[in-house]
Curated annotation (Swiss-Prot):
One of its GO terms (molecular function) is aspartate-tRNA ligase activity. Residues 196-199 are annotated as: Aspartate. Homodimer. Signal peptide: none annotated. Catalyzes the attachment of L-aspartate to tRNA(Asp) in a two-step reaction: L-aspartate is first activated by ATP to form Asp-AMP and then transferred to the acceptor end of tRNA(Asp). It comes from Haemophilus influenzae (strain PittGG). Gene3D superfamilies: Bira Bifunctional Protein, Domain 2, GAD-like domain, Nucleic acid-binding proteins. It is found in: Cytoplasm. Its EC number is 6.1.1.12. Its main location: cytoplasm. InterPro entries: Aa-tRNA-synt_II (IPR004364), aa-tRNA-synth_II (IPR006195), aa-tRNA-synth_II/BPL/LPL (IPR045864), Asp-tRNA-ligase_1 (IPR004524), Asp-tRNA-ligase_1_N (IPR047089), Asp/Asn-tRNA-synth_IIb (IPR002312), AspRS_core (IPR047090), GAD-like_sf (IPR004115). One of its GO terms (cellular component) is cytoplasm. This is Aspartate--tRNA ligase.
Length: 588
């Protein structure tokens, strides 16, 4: 037998037992004729010592170095009282080695487990990086999450059904990864960006509660929390309303947090998209941050200051204020840095006002814009934002979207910089009632979620007549500023689906070509259905306390969508390309 126990599982209950351990040398120390090692496996670390009493084992141990793969047979001993290590789960015991077997030696490591290695090093030698206890713990947490999800889904009547990986390219927002067909030359499969249409087809097939933990693929620009291939917890239901779907999914996430880290998330508040954007400048607000945006266009619309009065009198403009309690100590240098920061989001500047004494009106205000205000306007502003002595006010004034984006980003930065964001809290919420459509860069209407989302209380005729007023029957789950899941009630009427396609500029010929199978299926007694998808990688990221999604994926890609370990992507074999009838055009 190669193993009787995991290293990290040993405790006082094992004292006096003979055990067989298999794992790696984590650290080695020589002390006065004895050799000590910390031995590690996926479950943790235990101290092992070699005593002259077992000379063969001690002699063999002299050759041990870090990351040798070994087997130990020995006895679990209680540590002396003064040697108990409270920082180790196994710190009350140690193992007296009676036999040592070296499975494999190790070359000098290209990584140093005791120092910060570059991410490039960690990804190139990922198989070594994953030996680190913190990395092993993250992957164990991920496995625990998926195990919990499967149990919950099974207990709630959901069926785990697989959907195809080789499918048809359909417009879902990002570029597809294409797979050439050898049999059908000149044609391509697409790897799925999500199982969206297949799970809707499963509802039409009568499987009223479906789920799947599934790989998805998107060829898009990457960030710290995105990967070209990622994992979704994908869910779809029939005959349930949006609030009923949210209730089930909230119970799942509530239970997941309790099971994984022992945290009770409480009841999730529900907030409309409009409220989230107006108060927090984001459709995924981080409610740990107490700062809010307050609209003041009605107060400043008549001041003789174009920066304020122009957007204040423009239906598409916005003037908003963030009050920072006790922020008057912020220096001019810091204010200049914040002004530069909002410029990234298109803001032309950042007005500010320090409240040195709230009791003396404008006389107590220090601000380059004070000369444009009068006592009446200042009083109204101070009352609107509840200004107090020692506060600073930051003003954003521009187009609605620019002000909202810039001030929303500033809110987050101020919260971090000034220590206002309560990092030890969990703040979940649902965001609902998104706009059905938004304008793309060319000014055309695009679906804010996807083209299969149902509008709220709109007929096809009403939607076609006034699409920009339509509210989507959609919902996102947000935790601490991260969108962890999103879903919607789906369109189940063929006339409504064709109307949405037309609004998006997809003519009837394109509809038949791209979505003919869906439009046909909608004609045969389609049930009302709704669903949601969670990002498993992002959930794991939150539950393990890391800010980099690559830390919770065993073998992730870089931000350039490359695998440094296997050197993928690579050039294809010319013969394989010939069989696929593909010629490669060299980049200029």
């Amino acid at each position: 037998m190669m193993r009787t126990h995991y290293c990290g599982a040993l405790n006082r209950n094992n004292i006096g037992q003979d055990v067989t351990l298999s794992g790696w040398v984590h650290r080695r120390r020589d002390l006065g004729g004895l050799i000590f090692i910390d031995m590690r496996d996926r479950d943790g670390i235990v101290q092992v010592y070699f005593d002259p009493k077992y000379q063969d084992a001690l002699t063999a141990a002299a050759s041990l170095r870090n990351e040798f793969c070994i087997q130990i047979k020995g006895e679990v001993i209680a540590r002396p009282e003064n040697q108990i290590n409270k920082n180790m789960a196994t710190g009350e015991v140690e193992v007296l080695a009676k036999e040592l077997r070296i499975y494999n030696a190790s070359d000098v490591l290209p990584l140093d487990f005791n120092q910060n290695n570059t991410e490039e090093q960690r990804l190139k030698y990922r198989y070594l990086d994953l030996r680190r206890p913190e990395m092993a713990q993250r992957l164990k947490t991920r496995a625990k999450i998926t195990s919990f999800v499967r149990r919950f889904m099974d207990d709630n009547g959901f069926l785990d059904i697989e959907t195809p990986m080789l499918t048809k390219a359909t417009p879902e927002g990002a570029r597809d990864y294409l797979v050439p067909s050898r049999v059908h030359k000149g044609k391509f499969y697409a790897l799925p960006q999500s199982p969206q249409l297949f799970k809707q087809l499963l509802m039409m097939s009568g499987f009223d509660r479906y789920y799947q933990i599934v790989k998805c693929f998107r060829d898009e620009d990457l960030r710290a929390d995105r990967q070209p291939e990622f994992t979704q917890i994908d869910v779809e239901t029939s005959f349930l309303t949006a609030p009923e779907v949210r209730e089930i999914m909230e119970r799942m996430v509530h239970g997941l947090w309790l099971d994984t880290i022992g945290v009770d998330l409480g009841k999730f508040p529900v907030m409309t998209w409009q409220e989230a954007m107006c108060r927090f400048g984001s459709d995924k607000p981080d409610l740990r941050n107490p700062l809010e945006m307050v609209d003041v266009a009605d107060i400043v619309k008549d001041v003789e200051f174009k920066v304020f009065n122009e957007p204040a009198n423009n239906p598409n403009g916005r003037v908003a204020v963030i009050r920072v309690p006790n922020g008057a100590e912020i220096t001019r240098k810091q204010i200049d840095e914040y002004t530069q920061f909002v410029g990234i989001y298109g803001a032309k500047g950042l007005a500010w006002a320090k409240v040195n004494d709230i009791n003396v009106g404008l006389e107590g205000v220090q601000s380059p814009i004070a000369k444009f205000l009068n006592e009446e306007v200042w009083k109204a502003l101070a009352e609107r934002v509840n200004a107090q002595t020692g506060d600073i006010l930051f003003f954003g004034a521009d187009k609605w979207q620019t002000t909202t984006d810039a001030m929303g980003a500033l809110r987050l930065k101020l919260g971090r910089d000034l220590g206002l964001t309560r990092l030890d809290e969990w703040q979940p919420l649902w965001v609902i009632d998104f706009p059905m459509f938004e304008r793309d860069e060319e000014g055309n209407l695009a679906a804010m979620h996807h083209p299969f989302t149902s509008p709220k209380d709109f007929s096809p005729e009403q939607l076609e007549a006034d699409p920009t007023s339509a509210v989507a029957n959609a919902y996102d789950m947000v935790i601490n500023g991260y969108e962890v899941g999103g879903g919607s009630v789906r369109i189940f009427d063929p006339k409504m689906q064709q109307t949405v396609f037309r609004i998006l500029g997809i003519d009837e010929e394109q509809q038949r070509e791209k979505f003919g199978f869906l439009l046909d299926a909608l004609k045969f007694g389609t049930p009302p259905h709704a669903g949601l998808a969670f990002g498993l990688d992002r959930l794991t990221m939150l539950l393990t306390g890391t800010e980099n999604i690559r830390d919770v994926i065993a073998f992730p890609k870089t931000t350039a969508a490359a695998c440094l370990m296997t050197e993928a992507p690579s050039f294809a074999n010319p013969q394989a390309l010939e069989e696929l009838a593909i010629s490669v055009v060299k980049a200029e």
